[in-house]
Amino acid sequence: MEASAGLVAGSHNRNELVVIRRDGDPGPKPLRQQNGQVCQICGDDVGLNPDGEPFVACNECAFPVCRDCYEYERREGTQNCPQCKTRFKRLRGCARVPGDEEEDGVDDLENEFNWRDRNDSQYVAESMLHAHMSYGRGGVDVNGVPQPFQPNPNVPLLTDGQMVDDIPPEQHALVPSFMGGGGKRIHPLPYADPNLPVQPRSMDPSKDLAAYGYGSVAWKERMESWKQKQERLHQMRNDGGGKDWDGDGDDGDLPLMDEARQPLSRKVPIPSSQINPYRMVIIIRLVVLGFFFHYRVMHPVPDAFALWLISVICEIWFAMSWILDQFPKWFPIERETYLDRLTLRFDKEGQTSQLAPIDFFVSTVDPLKEPPLVTANTVLSILAVDYPVDKVSCYVSDDGAAMLTFEALSETSEFAKKWVPFCKKYSIEPRAPEWYFQQKIDYLKDKVAPYFVRERRAMKREYEEFKVRINALVAKAQKVPEEGWTMQDGTPWPGNNVRDHPGMIQVFLGQSGGHDIEGNELPRLVYVSREKRPGYNHHKKAGAMNALVRVSAVLTNAPYMLNLDCDHYINNSKAIKEAMCFMMDPLVGKKVCYVQFPQRFDGIDRHDRYANRNVVFFDINMKGLDGIQGPIYVGTGCVFRRQALYGYDAPKTKKPPSRTCNCWPKWCICCCCFGDRKSKKKTTKPKTEKKKRSFFKRAENQSPAYALGEIEEGAPGAENEKAGIVNQQKLEKKFGQSSVFVASTLLENGGTLKSASPASLLKEAIHVISCGYEDKTDWGKEIGWIYGSVTEDILTGFKMHCHGWRSIYCIPKLPAFKGSAPLNLSDRLHQVLRWALGSVEIFFSNHCPLWYGYGGGLKCLERFSYINSIVYPFTSIPLLAYCTLPAICLLTGKFITPELTNVASLWFMSLFICIFATGILEMRWSGVGIDDWWRNEQFWVIGGVSSHLFALFQGLLKVIAGIDTSFTVTSKGGDDEEFSELYTFKWTTLLIPPTTLLLLNFIGVVAGVSNAINNGYESWGPLFGKLFFAFWVIVHLYPFLKGLVGRQNRTPTIVIVWSILLASIFSLLWVRIDPFLAKNDGPLLEECGLDCN
């Protein structure tokens, strides 16, 4: 879509549409079309048969397949044509394979039975050997990890190719062609020693030399390039450069197209010296826990039975919570990407880029809490991303229908015409101007050109003027006119009533409008505000994201999408290419539903006392999940596959037979594998859905493996097959009453309908964002962002994993995205409250991981992780009780354990050692610092006794009484002094429980010490255990305490009054029940013999 001349607003229900943009949308650029003489599997030339005619593998449909792929498919694959599924017949000159029909004629016994002499001159030595032998040349193991290629003496060498015209006739050699199709051939090549010379092959004098490629200028140039690379490779081997043979090298002079065929990413397992001790300690800790609980249960405390029982229940709950959190971290991995290989394969210089298009989603609600300048920086970083501009579209969702956001976006589009060419010209990072100009670095380093200095200063002045204009709009928006806002042409702003307004779309930038100052094209920038009417449930952020999915499908329909919060800018301009290394990888990409990046933050104090960075979760838990089925979706910084969001199952892959012993029962093997795969229930599906694709079938260019198993694209007669499997009525019931959108869902590789005009597309876009479009459809249930929780991200990722998809965790060296985090504790607790409330809502919903999704594609340990993510708020009750126990013990003089024996002390000490050892080894393999680990432990207690507790009760009220709770948007970025709000405490009831706990434990410590002084030295021994227990609570609440008394007594008086009152009442109650005064031990009257009468 091109840039629009005006705002398009309308309501499908009211049959209204205003300001239609002009026609002339050229549409997305099509990918390079391949002719019929190119192999549709590997991309090489089809070549000729021994008679000099074009090689035809399948006599039924003449599907273009080269001889090498034909022989490999017959030998290693399904032996069927990829298009018509007809079994390949043996052709003259090919070896016989099991299953071939008996033939009467004897034409070539040598080829038929593969009788050949390896020293025969008809063979060619395979010489193109790449240093990274571990990838791209071998098979694939059960987990999809490429294995090193092993030479097979029964596999003949390649025998087709082209002759080289600069070699004497008596030394003509046949060299396999590696350059066709962009280097996408993936079938294994036979092993040969590169030190051997190229074996000559005689030419048939009866054939024309052109049949062998003789005299080809292109081949001559490629041969010269190949010779040079072979010389470098031979020299590297002679110089002891064999270090690269294990795949660890990074030599750019290795054979080019070998590099282009290599995987785009690889797994990097944690070294065994780091992960194995960690696993051993976990097992030891489980054993120690068993003995510990045996002692605790078998040794109650008679005089403090209630305290003992409460403590044991809390400890058992903590142990179960630890198991749910620990075992998903059993298989942590890291990943590497190869951007150079991605460039070689899909983005060659001087050629049309074949990288997949991507749609960016930015969501915002309230411009007063989410400053427009912050949103503008996010949009600018997207428009300047290092990606082909015709492949990028940015959609900004304004769920508040604010004219301020609309005008700020208009100003941003104008400034982008200057900012984007500056970023790409000098390759600056980051490409958000606010953060680029705030960098405290020497910007002259490696930038010695005087014109860069001048242009940087000029651009900084331009940005300062841009900020002035944005701030002026913000100041103007503070005073709302009584009659409402009006646009520049005097038209009333359609969104004056936030709860009742039509849908609005404005295209600011595009292909035919809004070029930058250098005349280059800019990415599309589209403003979207969905329709809102009273009486409709709009589902907050999840509903806004689903509206963006639909409107983007109508206008651009990119196969991939990336969603960002308005305060998360792109810090690494190559982040999208990092994600494409997984999404577009021919080996693993088809089953990847999304690529999640970690969240990194700016503006956090060095000590991070409120654990805003969440390093433990992003650098430990998420790495562990990546080794199972992938990380959970965290709401931002995630690249999605559009088809996965449409609720389709992941493509089924045919795994090679395992090399395990068949003498064990199947159920025993499953138990040993942690139950990753359960026996699948029999379903009555069409045969076309039951057919599994071979490794070669999934590598095709012409017909990519469709995630649904429902639609096959690109093959003749596919339209008839679609009509037989999926009818239009069912699709409209699933996706909604929009024929244009339904048609877009059938295009796995994206793209819009060329027959539709821009005006009709805009009208359809208004229709799909209407408030009633989702009624009686699967939106929010099976499609898109899932409804039912304020944490829609967890539900959405969970549904995709249940469909068998896997996700990828990508951690580039330069953080991909950065955002802002709440500075003060009150905002941080409200943020955690919202997350915990969403988990409670999921727990009481139909999508609870405890009972949903069995028999699907969700793995066992992945389910553990999801269960942990929704039950953790319930830990707040035992945590609150356990943190209260030290004060009770000190006030009453009792304790939760009896007097410890030597054996009991051994179990207690062993448990403490295992706890510390687990943390230390976890930090060792993950690289997390002890400060971050300890801050995470502290905030686990602070959030547990405040936000998680309130979320639990609010969730119960919502489920039982139907009382809905609303959340407020966390404030993003401000102009205040750095860290000025660090100690600011805003009034919130969340502050009362931790303050009360602090006062209770301080009172308990004072009371315990006073009691010990009154009763003498003997009482000091038991006191140490109680004091340690109390100090454990106080130390975990220390960041809260420091903020409470940190600066200028900013703590609200009402918080202090309520906390003191509750602590005093609680303490006096226990004193009244069981005072800690010394009891009278005088003689009994019956024993003293005195008659008092």
From Swiss-Prot:
Which segments sit on the Extracellular face? 302-303, 891-902, 961-988, 1042-1050
Q: Which cofactor does it need?
A: Mn(2+); Zn(2+)
Kindly list the positions annotated as binding Zn(2+) 1.
Answer: C39, C42, C66, C69
Q: Which SUPFAM superfamilies match?
A: Nucleotide-diphospho-sugar transferases (SSF53448), RING/U-box (SSF57850)
Q: What is its main location?
A: membrane
Q: How is the cofactor bound?
A: Binds 2 Zn(2+) ions per subunit.
Concerning CDD domains, the annotation shows: mRING-HC-C4C4_CesA (cd16617)
Localization, UniProt: Cell membrane
Chain residues that bind Zn(2+) 2: C58, C61, C81, C84
Report the coiled-coil segments.
453-480
Instruction: Cite the residue ranges of zinc fingers (RING-type).
Output: 39-85
Transmembrane residues, as ranges?
A: 281-301, 304-324, 870-890, 903-923, 940-960, 989-1009, 1021-1041, 1051-1071
Q: Catalytic residues?
A: D399, D793
Q: Where is the composition biased (Basic and acidic residues)?
A: 233-246
Per the record, what ranges lie on the membrane's Cytoplasmic side? 1-280, 325-869, 924-939, 1010-1020, 1072-1093
**Tell me, what is an example of a GO biological process annotation in this record?**
cell wall organization
PANTHER family given in the database record? X-BOX TRANSCRIPTION FACTOR-RELATED
What family is it from? Answer: Belongs to the glycosyltransferase 2 family. Plant cellulose synthase subfamily.
What role does this protein play? Probable catalytic subunit of cellulose synthase terminal complexes ('rosettes'), required for beta-1,4-glucan microfibril crystallization, a major mechanism of the cell wall formation.
Q: What is this protein called?
A: Probable cellulose synthase A catalytic subunit 3 [UDP-forming]
Upper taxonomic lineage = Eukaryota, Viridiplantae, Streptophyta, Embryophyta, Tracheophyta
Gene name tied to this protein: CESA3
